[in-house]
């Protein structure tokens, strides 16, 4: 089963919005075992859309459209497909009633062109829009399955999950279970990770292993197929165990977890609090933590100690130490972590100092980083890193390494 996704909308070609619909649909189709071989983006032009459809008809037996189902003149997806397939457009009474109720409820006049949103291809299966007005539709014609979905993601995603997915399962008799699991890694590059599990990747068939690198992290998507859901999950468990036996130290979570959500979760489980002294990261570490629900149970406070004056006056770093060792040093990172922990009466103090670049500082090249971690009742530890990349990349990777080292420390305590 080969699919093509055609996104309709000039705003996509102009770069005004990103085509997140194609990403979502590709993920959903992969879980159904349907191959997506092409993504096409077409502006609001009937001629070019017709040409794109004719091309797709030569190479796909499932074509999914997003966008162009609205009330205005440039919403032309339905009209173009109707003309190509020789189908009439007819009013779906249920959709029309829903549109009328919406305008009545909001006390707004319903213009005549809004009726256009209730038009569907004759003989199609109507996909109800429970989050907007224009319904989707799906049909099979001359051996090709067509599915038309609205453009707004808040309408398209729930529609596909509830109705589009079920239509495809019925149409293509998709009884096989597709189970996926994402393993998330940090502190190891894509090439090193792939080398460590090269034989597992080479031998893959079911489950499959798909590496992906980005934002200083690496993910492995494991996908298994089986008629029985429990057996598909067992297959995933088996290959996951083999992977973690080799690179488990670097695996911090699954699926949509992040280093920050995992760190917050582990600290909450311990009942521990944290405070940060941030020079290099400028508050980025605490910004990421406090953006999460439940952060108030964990975060005591922090200091952005960007200058040596603040390090000395607020956090008590002795001037002789700053003059002798510099702010970018192990002794400074150690004392920053210890002092911010004590000042905020937290269980853990963490510090970030270093050089984000692009210029050297105190004789240190860009990417030089020190992260200090002080736990109540213990000696502080300091991690030294040499990172590469842009200024922004070094700062966010430093904050992530702070989480990674915290998770390592918490795991070792278990």
From Swiss-Prot:
InterPro entries (UniProt xref): CinA, CinA-like_C, CinA_C, CinA_KH, Competence-induced_CinA, MoaB/Mog-like_dom_sf, MoaB/Mog_dom
CDD domains hit by this protein: cinA (cd00885)
Coiled-coil regions listed in the entry: none
Domain of life: Bacteria
Record family assignment: Belongs to the CinA family.
Name of the protein: Putative competence-damage inducible protein
Organism this protein belongs to: Geobacillus kaustophilus (strain HTA426)
Lineage: Bacteria, Bacillati, Bacillota, Bacilli, Bacillales
């Amino acid at each position: 089963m080969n699919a093509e996704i055609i996104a309709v909308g000039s705003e996509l070609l102009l770069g005004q919005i990103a085509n997140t619909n194609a990403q979502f649909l590709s993920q959903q189709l992969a879980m159904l075992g349907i191959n997506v071989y092409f993504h096409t983006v077409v502006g609001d032009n009937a001629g070019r859309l017709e040409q794109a459809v004719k091309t797709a008809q030569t190479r796909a037996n499932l074509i999914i459209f997003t966008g162009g189902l609205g009330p205005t003149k440039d919403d032309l997806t339905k009209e173009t497909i109707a003309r190509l397939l020789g189908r009439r457009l007819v009013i779906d009474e249920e959709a029309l009633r829903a549109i009328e109720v919406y305008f009545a409820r909001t006390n707004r006049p319903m213009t005549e062109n809004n009726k256009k949103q209730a038009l569907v291809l004759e003989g199609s299966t109507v996909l109800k829009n429970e989050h907007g007005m224009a319904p989707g539709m799906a049909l099979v014609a001359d051996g090709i399955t067509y599915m038309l979905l609205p453009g707004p993601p808040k309408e398209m995603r729930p529609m596909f999950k509830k109705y589009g997915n079920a239509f495809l399962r019925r149409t293509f008799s998709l009884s096989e279970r597709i189970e996926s699991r994402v393993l998330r890694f940090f502190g190891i590059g894509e090439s090193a990770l792939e080398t460590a599990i090269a034989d597992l990747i080479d031998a893959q068939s079911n489950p499959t292993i798909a590496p992906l690198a980005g934002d200083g992290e690496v993910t492995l998507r494991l996908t298994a197929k089986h008629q029985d859901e429990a057996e598909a999950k067992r297959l995933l468990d088996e290959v996951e165990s083999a992977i973690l036996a080799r690179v488990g130290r670097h695996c911090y979570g699954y699926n949509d977890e992040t280093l920050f959500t995992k760190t917050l979760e582990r600290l909450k489980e311990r009942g521990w609090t944290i405070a940060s002294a941030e020079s290099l990261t400028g508050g980025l570490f605490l910004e990421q933590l406090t953006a999460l629900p439940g952060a108030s149970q964990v975060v005591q406070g922090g200091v952005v100690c960007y200058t040596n004056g603040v390090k000395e006056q607020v956090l008590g770093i002795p001037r002789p130490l700053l003059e002798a060792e510099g702010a970018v040093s192990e002794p400074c990172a150690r004392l920053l972590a210890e002092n911010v922990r004590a000042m905020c009466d937290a269980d853990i103090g963490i510090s970030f100092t270093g050089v984000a670049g692009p210029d050297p500082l105190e004789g240190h090249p860009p990417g030089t980083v020190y992260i200090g971690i002080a736990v109540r009742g213990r000696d502080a530890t300091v991690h030294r890193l040499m990172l590469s990349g842009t200024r922004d990349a070094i700062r966010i990777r430093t904050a992530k390494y702070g989480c990674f080292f915290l998770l390592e420390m918490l795991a070792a305590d278990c």
